[in-house]
Amino acid sequence: MGFVDGFSAFLHSSGAVKFGDFELSGGGRSPYYFDLRSVPSHPHQFRGMIRGLLDSVISEVGLDRFDTLASIPTGGLVVASALAIEAVKPLVYARAAAKGHGTGRTVEGIVRYGARALIIDDVATTGGSVIRAAESLRAAGAIVTDAFVVIDRMEGAEGRLGAEGIKLHRLAGALEVARSLHAAGLIPGDVMRQVEGRTR
């Protein structure tokens, strides 16, 4: 069994991927929903996910091609924190908005001018949160050319990020997960076709 097949089966059995009718944070509705916030409650599978992510980062980007990991609270920060430990890389995170107190920074952590930052998030839908993080990081002097997500819902994030000069990488795509689950007999064909109808 390949990584995506095993990971997909775990997402399904743990309830981290659900099929039905869900409202997304952007206001739209979807026949499927990924909630990776529950994955750290399963330490063995969480470790496997982080190791799979590290292997993908090494093969697709290269540890020598970035200086720091940068994440987006809250879902992505848990993933990036574990990945930073495994990769032995510094970690910063970009807020959606500056705090109204303290330093008022939008980026927390040390960002050296000219540092190459690899953005890490849990799930990408349209790419909006990654774009906002990249804007904050670039304003702080970082260079952002790549972003890595655990799950790409495949609903336009890749194209939007590409227009911003950011290549999107993923551990798995929504369609890969659905096809794997269908092949394993865990979801019916009509559910898989609903996913196929939304992804691009």
Swiss-Prot record:
Keywords: Glycosyltransferase, Magnesium, Pyrimidine biosynthesis, Transferase. Orotate binds at residues 125, 153. NCBIfam families: pyrE. It catalyses: orotidine 5'-phosphate + diphosphate = orotate + 5-phospho-alpha-D-ribose 1-diphosphate. It holds the Pfam family Pribosyltran. The keyword Oxidoreductase does not apply. Homodimer. 5-phospho-alpha-D-ribose 1-diphosphate binds at residues 95, 99, 101, 121-129. Catalyzes the transfer of a ribosyl phosphate group from 5-phosphoribose 1-diphosphate to orotate, leading to the formation of orotidine monophosphate (OMP). The gene is pyrE. One of its GO terms (molecular function) is orotate phosphoribosyltransferase activity. It comes from Cenarchaeum symbiosum (strain A). It comes from the Archaea. Gene3D superfamilies: 3.40.50.2020. This is Orotate phosphoribosyltransferase. Its EC number is 2.4.2.10. Pathway: Pyrimidine metabolism; UMP biosynthesis via de novo pathway; UMP from orotate: step 1/2.
